[in-house]
Amino acid sequence: MTDKVVHFEIPADDLDRARAFYQQAFGWTINSLPELDYNIVETTPIDETNVPTEPGAINGGMMRRQAPINSPVITIGVDDIDAALQRVEELGGKTEIPKQGVADMGFTAYFSDPEGNLVGLWASAQPG
């Protein structure tokens, strides 16, 4: 099975303005996580474990714009971030932000592909 796009992120210079825009323009629910300086963006209904209930639908996040995350980013779910970053680099990509923990939820990292696009990786702390 191939790895899937599981998340998106939208950077913003003014988080209040960006939250209001996406809530009003698209009806998205946006919840702040101040302890992580991050916002959860719900574009589709979720279950009790915060997983989208509609097949193929994804939710995302919003955070303050800071390099290298200057434009929207898709995030690919993988089982092993270290192995994924190794493959990326073997194929001409570059690690931009190394693996880091996100509370007790999982791990994230960012890489640029050979075309210069920034892409995120996510590995859940919970298997499956």
PLM region spans:
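Vicinal oxygen chelate
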Residues: 10, 33, 85-128
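Short beta-strand micro-motifs in enzyme catalytic cores
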Residues: 37-41, 72, 105-109
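Core segments of cupin and vicinal oxygen chelate
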Residues: 2, 9-56
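Short strand-connecting beta-turns/loops that link adjacent beta-strands
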Residues: 15, 35, 67-69, 103-104
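N-terminal beta-strand motif that seeds the catalytic metal site of vicinal oxygen chelate
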Residues: 1-21, 71-76, 123-128
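Mid-chain, well-packed structural core segment of small domains
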Residues: 66-94
